[in-house]
């Protein structure tokens, strides 16, 4: 296993073990460092300058000139809401992976992809922080996210989350809407694309009364990408490859929704 701190490789190659990963994550978080384990390359990335999850630039897949120059989403304003953040950790996986880190990493990758295709992207948060204020009441925090989307007059709103359940075998992808026909159509586009892209179980498109999709004034969905409580899906959510696939899949769902 490699350990890379602030872009520099540490001259040791310890054997991968669950205990070592948990220890590294515990140390990093106690010092407010960002940490990410790439399962495919057996590499731990640590960012000592920020608590944000590191996304190594050299790991980013090169976009083709056509993708980089595309304007097919020009004129579209898309609000992306990385679930949780700051004092709100969200759910925690079996090995200590934190939901707020996963959602932010996926959202940032999605933002980059959307902007390369001409969209104007509004992020409710771009770092590991509370959107309103630390330890605010839930409705105040969620209301701040809704206000950002409504204030930007966004065309669509997408809130990104990880699912969790007490039974670790629970698995799959679900996309929620609040019943508006266009929200249902957006949910179907994203759900189909995510299931195909990640190869997860299709848990379907469902109605829910979540605050952020109930009070937004545009087509809105809340996406549960996969179960962080499921050991296998936790690995996908925490990996660079899994996060890219999730971001790319949501992007393709958005493209299908706008029919561009």
Task: List where the protein language model places each region.
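Catalytic-core regions of hydrolytic enzymes
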Residues: 60-188, 196
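Solvent-exposed coil/turn segments that connect beta secondary-structure elements
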Residues: 8, 49-51, 83-85, 126-127, ...
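Proline/glycine-rich low-complexity loops and linkers
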Residues: 190-203
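Active-site-adjacent mobile loop/cap segments within catalytic or ligand-binding domains
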Residues: 159, 166, 204-260
């Amino acid at each position: 296993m490699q350990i890379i701190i602030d872009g520099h490789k540490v001259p040791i190659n310890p054997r991968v073990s669950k205990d070592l990963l948990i220890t590294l994550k515990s140390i990093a978080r106690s010092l407010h460092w960002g940490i990410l384990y790439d399962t495919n390359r057996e590499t731990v990335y640590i960012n000592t300058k920020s608590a944000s999850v590191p996304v190594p630039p050299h790991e980013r897949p090169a976009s083709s000139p056509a993708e980089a120059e595309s304007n097919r989403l020009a004129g579209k304003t898309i609000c992306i809401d990385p679930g949780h953040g700051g004092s709100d950790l969200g759910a925690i996986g079996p090995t200590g992976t934190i939901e707020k880190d996963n959602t932010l990493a996926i959202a940032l990758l999605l933002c980059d992809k959307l902007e390369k295709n001409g969209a104007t992207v509004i992020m409710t948060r771009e770092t590991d922080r509370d959107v309103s204020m630390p330890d605010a009441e839930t409705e105040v925090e969620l209301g701040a996210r809704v206000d950002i989307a409504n204030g930007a007059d966004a065309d669509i709103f997408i809130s990104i989350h990880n699912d969790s359940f007490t039974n670790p075998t629970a698995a799959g992808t679900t996309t929620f809407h609040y019943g508006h026909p266009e929200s249902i159509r957006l949910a179907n586009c994203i759900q189909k694309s995510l299931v195909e892209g990640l190869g997860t179980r299709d848990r379907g498109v469902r109605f829910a009364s979540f605050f952020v999709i109930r009070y937004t004034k545009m087509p809105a969905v809340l996406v549960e990408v996969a179960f962080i409580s499921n050991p296998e899906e936790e690995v996908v959510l925490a990996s660079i490859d899994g996060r890219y696939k999730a971001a790319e899949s949501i992007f393709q769902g958005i493209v299908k929704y706008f029919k561009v």
